Design a protein with these regions (language model features):
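Short aromatic/hydrophobic contact patches that present stacked aromatics
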Residues: 3, 98, 131-133
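Short coil/turn motifs at secondary-structure junctions
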Residues: 85-87, 104, 137
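Conserved acetyl-CoA-binding loop-helix of GNAT-fold acetyltransferases
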Residues: 98-101, 107-121, 142-147
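Conserved beta-strand-loop-alpha-helix junction that forms the acyl-donor binding cleft
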Residues: 132-142
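Conserved catalytic-core motifs of GNAT/GCN5-like acyltransferases
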Residues: 133, 146-164
């Protein structure tokens, strides 16, 4: 059974372990928790929770962003985030939604599921046209985006831009 849970400052060792499994940087997805101590992870949870409630742009670039975890039968298998609006830089790389599945849970359809659920959440906060970018060589993510209604609108030497209209 699938469940998408919003990040909580009370998230525990199961989420910490998931974030240790997800590489620090892979296919344009950055995971700042990989390599942190459990105490540092708990501090990260507080910061990420605050980002969700932020108003406007912070530090000249950080937009409000809500983080979620995909659970399968009670086990966290992936994470994703929704950026509430876009800066010019995020229009080039990043877009509204970023997501990643732990390497040990890939090729099971979980990427498609987390993106489907993140799209629903994005609609719930008022985002009607969703931009998602992916690396040119990230074929798995391209398939996931297309399966969720993504339309390729632009391609550069490094990235593909997709819009999902909800």
């Amino acid at each position: 059974m699938f469940e998408l849970r919003k990040l909580s400052i009370n998230d525990g060792i199961d989420v910490y372990n998931l974030l240790q499994d997800i590489p620090k940087e892979e296919n344009g997805f950055g995971n700042k928790v990989n390599g942190l101590t459990y105490g540092e992870y708990k501090e990260w949870l507080v910061k990420r929770d605050q980002y969700s409630n932020q108003v406007g742009i912070l530090d000249g670039w950080r937009v409000p962003e809500t983080t979620f975890f995909l659970y399968v039968d009670g086990i966290p298998v992936g994470m994703g985030s929704i950026r509430h609006f876009l800066t010019e830089a995020l229009k080039e790389v990043g877009g509204h939604i970023g997501y990643c599945i732990s390497p040990k849970y890939r090729q099971k359809g979980y990427g498609k599921e987390i993106l489907k659920r993140l799209i629903i959440e994005a609609r719930g906060i008022g985002i009607t046209d969703i931009l998602i970018t992916t690396n040119l060589d990230n074929f798995a993510s391209q398939k996931v985006i297309l399966a969720n209604g993504g339309k390729e609108i632009d391609r550069s030497s490094e990235h593909i831009h997709f819009w999902i209209y909800v």
